[in-house]
Amino acid sequence: MLAKRIIPCLDVKEGRVVKGTQFLSLRDAGDPVELAAFYDKEGADELVFLDISASHEGRETMVDVVREVAATLAIPFTVGGGINTLADIRRILRAGADKVSINTAALLRPAFIREGADYFGSQCIVVAIDAKFDQALGTWRVYTHGGRKQTNWLATDWAKEAVRLGAGELLVTSMDQDGAKTGFDLPLLKAINEVATVPVIASGGAGAANDFVDVFKYNYADAALAASIFHYKETSIQEVKARLREEGECIR
């Protein structure tokens, strides 16, 4: 059995880590380099760095900050935001990242997933899916540009297509649960897990250690990502791992 992974997420805007609710109402959470070093020492299994306004603002990811963060880490590091070309992927990997997360660019041009996987390997390509429940459809719809633009893709269909094109991992964020701290969106994750044949990272909604227990108990995800509960010291990675050990989960 593969060990479940606990992944802190650094949402970065203008060089600072921020966190909001449902992608809005952002507040400062600290310096990305300092937080990265802290999480590495605390026992994080991986780290995700998302330049959350790069795609919306049409600019490149902050490579200098990525390089600084990578220099502090001994754990795998994924970077996303504003990655639109193979040259962007190469630049981020050379700056020290192990994987890239692509979202808007993949939806605008799905062939980009295959190009990235063919050139750098599927293990480097994480496709991020920002999904929000559509009451009229009774299912989840995918959004781009940091949750600002609705697409015609249903989350389950896009997950299947992303995997078919070469995604090595899916980072699934529930926009409904983002920052709400009421637990991961288990119905969404169940739906994605049923169609995905690659590892799924659960994101959006973690509010306590028991939320990690729930998402792993049903095997709806291979890893779980959280931001605000770690940034604001509401719980710690060690506390989450201790709780998972109590439940008999396989963790690092």
From Swiss-Prot:
It comes from the Bacteria. Its EC number is 4.3.2.10. It catalyses: 5-[(5-phospho-1-deoxy-D-ribulos-1-ylimino)methylamino]-1-(5-phospho-beta-D-ribosyl)imidazole-4-carboxamide + L-glutamine = D-erythro-1-(imidazol-4-yl)glycerol 3-phosphate + 5-amino-1-(5-phospho-beta-D-ribosyl)imidazole-4-carboxamide + L-glutamate + H(+). One of its GO terms (cellular component) is cytoplasm. Pfam families: His_biosynth. It is an enzyme of class 4 (lyase). PANTHER family: IMIDAZOLE GLYCEROL PHOSPHATE SYNTHASE HISHF (PTHR21235:SF2), IMIDAZOLE GLYCEROL PHOSPHATE SYNTHASE SUBUNIT HISF/H IGP SYNTHASE SUBUNIT HISF/H (PTHR21235). This is Imidazole glycerol phosphate synthase subunit HisF. The gene is hisF.
